[in-house]
Amino acid sequence: MGYFSLIIVITIISFLNAEGIDSQELPIGLTDFEKNNINLLLEMGRETSPPNQPVRNIAEFERMSGVLVRYPLGVSLDIIRELAEDVIVYCLVSSAQQNTALNAFNNNDINMGNIQFIVGPTDSYWTRDYGPWWVVDGNKEVGIVDFTYNRPRLNDNNAPFKTSEYLDVPYYSVDMIHCGGNYMTDGRGIGASSHLVYEENDLESENIDSLMNIYYGIDTYHVVEDPNDTYIDH
């Protein structure tokens, strides 16, 4: 897989009147059930060997060739149409809803030549939070590095692995609870998150910093108070 043959996980914004949005979607925050069963996160973790060193975590602003969304959508079909004019739209969709997604895209004049379905169940459309992060390993090979999604949503948590299987790229996972919305990197070894990453893991901060270095190539990890002071802490 070439260096630029990557996916950027776009931030999903919920528009109240956007076409194709399912009103029954799980919220970005925890539901009451999830709050009462947060211990399920401990059963979702997986760990692999880290990528060959040195590792470089690819920044979201770098050149990409595709985007990752999920159906039912969290963005309008108009946005999907615009995206599909220029890049491949990889769409996570359950087998039960694949035909519905196909019909919705066809009926809205979307370029189906740039639509690829990754089939499997998901729990929500917050792909920016649970989707894959990309690295280049010491052999200059592009792969996915995953964490345990900080919501007890097993199907969402499995999305990065399903993506790696579909694209046939290496998959690595660190047994650490995290959230894509609470992480960003400059692509040159510097990363940043809110203090939530320290609070959600039963690990010393030094251990978390070390895992970020080994799996993501982050040499300088800025963990700060949530500057927005929001309930989701990122």
Segments predicted by a language model, with ranges:
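The feature marks the mature, well-folded catalytic cores of soluble enzymes
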Residues: E19-H234
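Bacterial Sec-dependent N-terminal signal peptides
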Residues: M1-S23
